[in-house]
A protein has these predicted regions:
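Cysteine-dependent deubiquitinase/ubiquitin-like isopeptidase catalytic cores across multiple families
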Residues: 1-172, 176-179
Length: 179
């Protein structure tokens, strides 16, 4: 099926409950496992989020969600998949930098995210991503994403009082002085 014909045949379904969604995907699992399954999953997430809400979360609407030359998903797209928010940053909470509000990860994620870019000091991943609810992480390298997981439950834990205090302090310590 050519891609243009695929798009012509798309049908938008509305569901009232999560049970309806689960039943639909259970009954139509083969649709998601076919040639355009990932694209259908992407469309499902984007339509569920809604155009207006998506635009309100993306800092730079000129940045594409998918890189046109290489097909890489943007950080906003990765964050949308992992947290439900299409924010461009991986730090904890929102930050105000010189009057510009930068949206970050606003709560502990079910699935974590870590990146080689942090080791290179390009970004700082917050504790909400580093310490997810489940011991599953997406690891980003320069060219691809890898899913890591473990049955070892001790790798993740709820945020401690000290971690909570440090996170709150860091919200107000915008220059990272530590004082």
């Amino acid at each position: 099926l050519p891609i243009d014909l695929f798009h012509e045949r798309l049908i938008l379904n509305d569901f009232e409950t999560i049970e309806d969604v689960e039943k639909f995907f259970s009954d139509h699992y083969s649709v998601l496992s076919n040639r355009y399954g990932v694209l259908l999953f992407l469309y499902s997430i984007l339509f569920t989020k809604g155009y207006e809400k998506l635009l309100s979360e993306i800092n730079d609407i000129s940045e594409p969600l998918i890189h046109s030359n290489f097909g890489y998903g943007s950080q906003s797209l990765i964050n949308l998949f992992l947290t439900g928010r299409a924010v461009a940053h991986v730090f904890d909470n929102d930050q105000d930098i010189g009057g510009m509000k930068l949206l970050g990860i606003n709560r502990q994620s079910d699935i974590g995210f870590i990146t080689l870019m942090e080791q290179l000091r390009y970004v700082q991943v917050g504790s909400f991503y580093k310490n997810p609810k489940y011991s599953i992480w997406v690891l980003a390298s320069e060219t691809h994403l890898t899913v890591l997981f473990s049955n070892e439950k001790s790798l993740v834990s709820p945020e401690t009082a000290a971690e909570h205090a440090r996170r709150i302090f860091n919200q107000y310590d915008t220059e990272n002085t530590g004082n």
